[in-house]
Amino acid sequence: MMTDLVSATSQSLARDPMVGLRLARVDGFEPAVALGTDELPAYLRRFTMLFADDATMRRGGIGRVTRAVNAQGEAVALKQLILPTRDEFDDDAAHEALVTKFKAAFREEYECHRALSGLKGFPRLYGWGEVGGVPAIVMEWVEGETLARLRSRFAVDDAGRLSPLVAARLGRDLFDLLCRMSLVGEGFVHRDISPANIM
């Protein structure tokens, strides 16, 4: 009897893609693109109530990215700022100054991404808001592996070196991507080109 209940529950969980997801409400959502007044309500509904899968969370420099789905089942990436904790500081002023600095850097990252959104090779940006009082960016979810995770599969020796052909192809594709950045108005400098940020 108990075995049947466990089996039925397991089957139910396997079929329900929403099980194990955390509700992430994006407050103060600002769309990344200009929208007409008739388009705004649907856009807000699309990106302000998300279901985040914390099992997919990956941490970067000052943020963490989690795969989330909206009510329509569309996958998006929810990137949240990682704020410094209070216990790392002796005084409140130093802590608050660092929090302000982190928030400004995260907003600058959003604005830079906004300039590149829509260019081939860059994830589409949907908007900015806060989740639980923490700044957040909603963008296109890109399925795949980072170069940092894949490079061992492409290695030709124990030192992790790539074959000249693979290295040349990666270099060519990265160069092509960097050239597209010149299409942005006054130019653009990417400050975090690394294998962890290349998919």
Residue ranges of model-derived segments:
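Catalytic-loop of the protein kinase fold
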Residues: 182-199
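Protein kinase glycine-rich loop
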Residues: 54-60, 65
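Activation segment signature within eukaryotic-like protein kinase domains
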Residues: 170-171
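AlphaC helix of the eukaryotic protein kinase fold
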Residues: 93-115
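AlphaC helix of the protein kinase catalytic domain
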Residues: 147-161
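Activation-segment/catalytic-loop signature of the eukaryotic protein kinase fold
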Residues: 128
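Conserved short submotifs of the Hanks-type protein kinase catalytic core
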Residues: 132-146
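Juxta-kinase regulatory segment immediately upstream of eukaryotic protein kinase catalytic domains
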Residues: 2-48, 52
